[in-house]
Structures are given as structure tokens and as C-alpha cells.
């Protein structure tokens, strides 16, 4: 299993490592959503700092996956998702996924887990705030 799932007070932290296939990514989401704690969470942190997408994953795969994810919106509509990545391909895929506008979650990408946690802590409910960024910030612009 190229991922670990850790349940936290009001959310879940998922750490991926190695080369991740689309099937493994789907399995991680299935495992997360099938847990009884999923209905009560407020955030998902997906940490890809030690992972790379498998070369066969395409933007079409991401589009199809995003549409499928939209079906789960009402399972937990107040969830916010923070994607943590610095690998160029991971960042490109994260931003492409965000740009589709069909994700059931308010989604943003960050370069560090600390920045992701800050964003989550400063967004108590829907109507998420965009953080003000300065030239020294490591946070990416969230897409809401």
C-alpha cells in the first residue's frame, strides 16, 4: 500500500509515497470514505511530498475521477481538501483538478503541511477565505 491514512479530530491526513497508480489512489479514497468517521470530518489533507503519479495517469483520468467524486458531495458537504505537493507533475495535476470546478470539496494546494493546516484552521465553514499571499509565502493560491 503506497499510502497511510491517519484519522485526526475533525479530519483525515493521507500520506502517499512512491509511484501512485490510479487504482491505488482510488483504493485510498474508497478506504477513507468507507470508514464510519468519514461522515463527520471537516478536512482532508493529501500529502504527496514523497509521491509521484504513475506515468500512465492522464488529465482525462483526473476529469473522470472528479466527476465521480462529485457524486459524494452530500456525504460530507463541509469538507475542505488541502493538497500538499512540490513535485512539478503533482502540482500540475492538483491545479488541473482544482480548475475543473467539479470537485465536491473546496480544494487548494500547498507546498507544506503546515501551510495546509493553517489554511484549514482559518476557514471555519463554507465560504472559504483566500489567504493573502506575499512574495515570501510558500503557499499556492487556493482555488475555490
Question: What are the language-model segments listed below?
Answer:
Residues 1-144:
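Amphipathic, Lys/Arg-enriched alpha-helical "gate/interface" segment within cytosolic domains
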Amino acid at each position: 500500500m503506497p499510502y497511510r491514512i491517519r484519522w485526526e479530530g475533525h479530519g483525515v491526513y493521507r500520506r502517499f509515497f512512491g509511484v501512485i497508480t490510479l487504482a491505488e489512489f482510488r483504493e485510498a479514497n474508497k478506504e477513507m470514505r468507507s470508514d464510519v468517521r468519514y461522515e463527520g470530518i471537516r478536512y482532508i489533507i493529501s500529502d504527496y511530498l514523497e509521491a509521484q503519479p504513475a506515468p500512465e495517469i492522464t488529465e482525462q483520468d483526473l476529469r473522470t475521477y472528479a466527476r465521480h467524486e462529485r457524486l459524494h458531495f452530500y456525504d460530507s458537504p463541509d469538507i475542505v481538501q488541502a493538497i500538499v505537493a512540490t513535485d512539478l507533475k503533482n502540482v500540475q495535476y492538483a491545479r488541473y483538478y482544482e480548475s475543473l470546478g467539479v470537485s465536491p470539496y473546496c480544494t487548494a494546494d500547498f507546498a507544506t503541511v503546515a501551510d495546509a493546516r493553517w489554511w484549514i484552521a482559518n476557514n471555519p465553514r463554507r465560504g472559504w477565505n483566500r489567504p493573502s499571499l506575499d512574495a515570501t509565502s510558500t503557499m499556492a493560491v487556493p482555488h475555490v
